[in-house]
Amino acid sequence: MIVLGIESSCDETGLAIYDYSKKKLIADELYSQVKLHKKYGGVVPELASRKHIAKLNLLAKKIFKETGLSFEDIDCIAYTAMPGLVGALMVGATFAKTLGLIHNIDTIAVHHLEGHLLSPLLDHNSNIEYPFVALLVSGGHTQLFEVKEFGEYSLLGESIDDAAGEAFDKTTKLLGMGYPGGVEVANLADQATDKSKYILPRPMKNKPNLDFSFSGLKTAVLNTWYDEQDQSLENKANLCYAFQDAAIDVLVSKCAKALQKTKNTRLVISGGVSANKLLRHQLDLLAKNRGYQIFFPPMKYCTDNGAMIALAGAYRYVNGFKDSNLEINVKARSPL
């Protein structure tokens, strides 16, 4: 069973083809709009939608040409329907529905977060058994789930204000750095010369619940930098280190609590921030010290991509889900 996946929820235009029977990704194409939006310091929704319109058909032609497949080989077309930028979602959904109608192929709406949650399965060495705890950590979401079976997601905790990735992005703006924030902060943190110069708060780390808060950490960065007399690149690197260390410390601590609370031994990490080297290192240490299994997506599939949508669509399709009509129903916000 072969699925074409379409991702257009924000500023990445992604198409991929996944073979469920072989558990194999056949092809994957991605167009990133980072350079387009960088000069604005963030994603401009109208520009994102227009670029999706310009690129989707081109990527589709390329992916079929390179694989030698045709639409006759496709059993289902999966597309991101929620959450995301409504205009961008509409472009992808309309493209998918149109292809389905023309070629008489079933279509299926996919939740963007479900795509991220399943993305570690794109690693051929990942054989994840249920149940497990999942941390979805990105620019838009920071959430902990207990996953008992496919489609059974119990929310354990989430950010009550900024998402972790959003805090990274806002920190780069406060420090006059570039976009996107996660990469900029991590790279500069690696250049820190005095890792103990700044001590920042760990919001909600010691709270018994599994919720997060990163707004206060962001404010602490702002106040610390405002009061700093020597705003040199060296001190900027030291502050980036302190910020990253605090944010990662909170994420790892909450993951440990979630595993203890649910009595699970398997942990899945996904979303854009899952590419962070320090986060991966600290969670690997946690797993090693306590005998847990931990699963990450391949690095190239941490951020938004069509491969995870094709994968999630395949799992939904074999579980009996598919669109019943041509109605397009996309949502800016939607819980998993």
UniProtKB/Swiss-Prot annotation:
Cofactor note: Binds 1 Fe(2+) ion per subunit.
Main location: cytoplasm
Catalyzed reactions per annotation: L-threonylcarbamoyladenylate + adenosine(37) in tRNA = N(6)-L-threonylcarbamoyladenosine(37) in tRNA + AMP + H(+)
CDD domains: ASKHA_NBD_TsaD_bac (cd24133)
Pfam families for the chain: TsaD
GO biological process: tRNA threonylcarbamoyladenosine modification
Enzyme class: transferase
Localization per record: Cytoplasm
One annotated Gene Ontology cellular component of this protein: cytoplasm
Essential cofactor(s): Fe(2+)
Keywords, in A-Z order: Acyltransferase, Cytoplasm, Iron, Metal-binding, Transferase, tRNA processing
Family affiliation: Belongs to the KAE1 / TsaD family.
Function: Required for the formation of a threonylcarbamoyl group on adenosine at position 37 (t(6)A37) in tRNAs that read codons beginning with adenine. Is involved in the transfer of the threonylcarbamoyl moiety of threonylcarbamoyl-AMP (TC-AMP) to the N6 group of A37, together with TsaE and TsaB. TsaD likely plays a direct catalytic role in this reaction.
Protein name: tRNA N6-adenosine threonylcarbamoyltransferase
Gene: tsaD
